């Protein structure tokens, strides 16, 4: 289960980076902000999973 959540976090981070880059390329501030938000969500999920791992081992 934890592996699934970790891969989900990485996927959110990657999608966020891509969306942010696309937003910058076309000059769309909203898309850029949404990309940053997705990256932050992925970062938070990854931090949560790392915290869980600390208590498991």
Swiss-Prot record:
Native source species: Streptomyces coelicolor (strain ATCC BAA-471 / A3(2) / M145)
Name of the protein this chain belongs to: UPF0337 protein SCO0678
A Pfam cross-reference name: CsbD
Basic and acidic residues bias spans: 1-22, 42-57
Entry similarity comment: Belongs to the UPF0337 (CsbD) family.
Disordered, as annotated region: 1-57
Matching InterPro entries: CsbD, YjbJ_sf
């Amino acid at each position: 289960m934890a592996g699934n959540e970790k891969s989900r976090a990485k996927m959110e981070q990657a999608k966020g980076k891509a969306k942010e880059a696309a937003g910058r390329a076309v000059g769309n501030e909203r898309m850029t902000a949404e990309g940053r938000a997705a990256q932050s969500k992925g970062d938070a999920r990854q931090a949560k999973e790392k915290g869980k791992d600390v208590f498991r081992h």
